[in-house]
Amino acid sequence: GGLTLQGLDDNAAGLGVMLELAERLKNIPTKYSIRFVATSGEEEGKLGAENLLKRMSAEEKKNTLLVINLDNLIVGDKLYFNSGQSTPSSVRKLTRDRALALARTHGVYAATNPGGNPQYPKGTGCCNDGEVFDKAGIPVLYVEATNWALGKKDGYQQRSKSKAFPDGTSWHDVRLDNQQHIDKALPQRIEHRSRDVVKVMLPLVKELAKAGKA
């Protein structure tokens, strides 16, 4: 789609949520530093994430306690929180499991990969920028909306096939991944899902960074 592709689901909404979190956290002191990063070139081979990792020193890698990957938050049936395959179980509890608990507390429907495909074990995610850091041994929390029960059960098919979304996906399609189409097919989904993600991620990031009072 080039310059005509809005890419609202993939991944303008993810960027918007990240900026909202940055705005809300900017005046709050934290024990652990938070870095907000937008990487490009994911579709061409995770080029931005690879470049970022390559430029990190050994000390920076060691001090990176968690990477949170926000991607494809709108069109998918369900909001998912998944861990990187190399993420230790202790970190999974503090991140993925805590996110699911916060979602329940705030009335947000969320799930984790049920593990229907042996290549993607239960509770883990894959196939986006977070994977670069996962392979480098850095803990990852994937935040996405899709439906891991459909298709090859690999998280690729976001929702059931329909007239509005013939392949059950919207990404990379200039006709489908835009505000006008999504608003018509899924009224108020953009606003509601974006708010839901912030409802969970804001308290989670505050907890993890050991935030003080503004």
Please report, for each region that a protein language model flagged, where it lies by residue.
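Second-shell loop/turn segments in exported
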Residues: 2-11, 24, 38-39, 79-90, ...
